[in-house]
Amino acid sequence: MFFSIIGFLSIGISAYAQDILTADHFLASVAERYASIKDYQAKVSIESAKVAMKGSIIHKRPNLLRIDFSQPVEQVIAYNGETLTVYLPEYRAVLSQSSPTAGKVATASLASAQGLSTMRRNYTASFTTGPDPVPLDEKSAELVIKLTLTRRSMSEGFRELKLAISPETKLIRRIEGRTIADEQVILDFSDIVLDQGIPEARFAYDSPASANRYNNFLFKEND
């Protein structure tokens, strides 16, 4: 009986290890998919207990990013390869950060090759419910493969990430993050269009002249 129990536990441990490896392999294939994408545009929504935001996002490899929000109206987040700019119309304020590191901050938790590289390096992946596609939501007809990513160290801002990925396109449909303060943040991506040859000029943002500017809002340039 003792050896039967040991054998049963060994099978369970082996299956668990195989699940982790398979999930990591699938995440690697998603990362390869995003590494092959030159640019994309999509609709994006960001929700938490405190805010609900909607807008359109454009991204160009390796780290150019712009989000134009329709909610809040006129709010913008843009990174042009040199400067990260955030315009907050409610406060007539422009926050800017000029540093190569700012680009990594901008794309670290987004659907991008750089973001996926960060996830693979700093999180351990497993299937949320198994390797088979499941509904995106309880009543949704859209099927996705769900991964749960658990942080490897306490230094990560999100202690857990959940990804919903299209099994056909290997594009991320949803990212759910659980912060260290136990707050949930959800990013939804829809109407994704790939490789349209988005020009770099579209990532430049001219802020209103009347807005107040606050430089180096993340960190000092020499930090």
Regions found by a protein language model. Name each.
Residues 52, 71-73, 157-160:
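Short, small/polar residue-rich loop motifs at catalytic or cofactor-binding pockets
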Residues 50, 90-92, 181:
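Solvent-exposed strand-loop boundary residues in beta-sheet-rich modules
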Residues 92, 97-142:
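Flexible, surface-exposed loop/linker segments and immediately adjacent secondary-structure boundaries
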Residues 57-110, 185-186:
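An acidic-aromatic
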Residues 121-217:
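Gly/Pro-enriched, hydrophobic low-complexity segments
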Residues 12-53, 61, 196, 207-223:
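N-terminal leader/targeting segments and the immediate start of mature chains
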Residues 1-12:
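Bacterial N-terminal signal peptides
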